[in-house]
Amino acid sequence: MVNDLSNDLSNAALTPAERAPRPIAAGVDIGHVHLKTADIDRVHDFYVGVLGFDVIARMPSALFLSAGGYHHHLGFNTWESAGGSPPPPGTTGLYHVAIRYPTRAALGDALRRLADAKWPIDGASDHGTHEAIYLRDPDQNGLELAWDRPESDWPRDAEGRLRSERAAPDLADLLAAADDL
């Protein structure tokens, strides 16, 4: 399934595979993600203590976090989920949230933070367009921590379409890049 998606993405280039009859406005982006959590303190310790997000607001049943002063990039609440368990495998729902870092050094710093916290990593990949680290948060939500290469460096075929790549990244080199911060 993932390979099918990679093939579909590689053929899409930067032109949609299917254009909506009434396309959404260019420039629309995802402003924030709001997730249910079993434990506000536990997600606070991970997202603030390990990844380094700033707390914008904290209440007994909700937490709002930001990277760089936005009103919030991530929201968490226990309104319907306090003490709950993650959804079982084989059900629909969130696959992962990608957190994009501005530089390779910043992604290397994130990897260092995870290593320092002894946080388990599910995998890592160099996709050609970006490098990514995959992991699970305390509620078992999938996270992709990623750095996008400049678009001019993205791999393309002879017709100019994006090529999907999946290679093992040099994690030691990525960690060393954090020294540039």
List PLM regions with ranges.
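Mature N-terminal segment immediately following signal peptide/propeptide cleavage
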Residues: V28-A38, D54-V55
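Short coil/loop residues immediately preceding or within conserved phosphate-binding loops
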Residues: I30, P60, L94, H130
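Amphipathic alpha-helical segments
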Residues: D39-D54, R113
